[in-house]
From Swiss-Prot:
Belongs to the AIM11 family. GO terms for cellular component: membrane. The chain crosses the membrane at residues 56-78, 105-127. Keywords: Membrane, Transmembrane, Transmembrane helix. InterPro entries: AIM11. The gene is AIM11. This is Altered inheritance of mitochondria protein 11.
Amino acid sequence: MSLAIIPFITIGWLRCTRKSRDTMSSSPEPQAPMHVTQRQISVFSDEFRQRRRQQMLRFFGATAFTLLSARLAFRGTINRKYVPNMFQLNHRVPLASSQGEALHAFAYGSGLATGGFAMLILGTCWLADVSTVPEFSLRIKALLGESDTQSGRLESAHQDKETRELAAMLDSLLQEKKD
């Protein structure tokens, strides 16, 4: 046996004996009471899955609109590019309708801006699990320090009946266990 292996064997032996001493202690450690939130329960309901699917589809719809607007704007820019032929002057401006070009530029810019902002807003709402305007206002009020009685409505705002019943049963069981 080489001398280089001996320190590793010694360290391993010390770890094993320390673990066995720790498990042999006679006083068990008190465990903190387990608290299950209503949100953790509602993750498994079909209503929650449908809600998240709707948020995802809204975001992907905004993304598709943005990509379509970008493609149209790119294609419109390429079509307006002036490439002179063999015997045409390159310093001469081609005939074009300035009103039509302004209208197209406004439409492309509006489409890109609307799509970008829609992606930003819907993506943020998807991450924050917000589906409706009243739910958004409740979340903002909770962030700004509204009283807890108002924020209690926020937790139960998007739960189905079965989830609320299960949460009530678990809370009552935990209360009985504490008493």
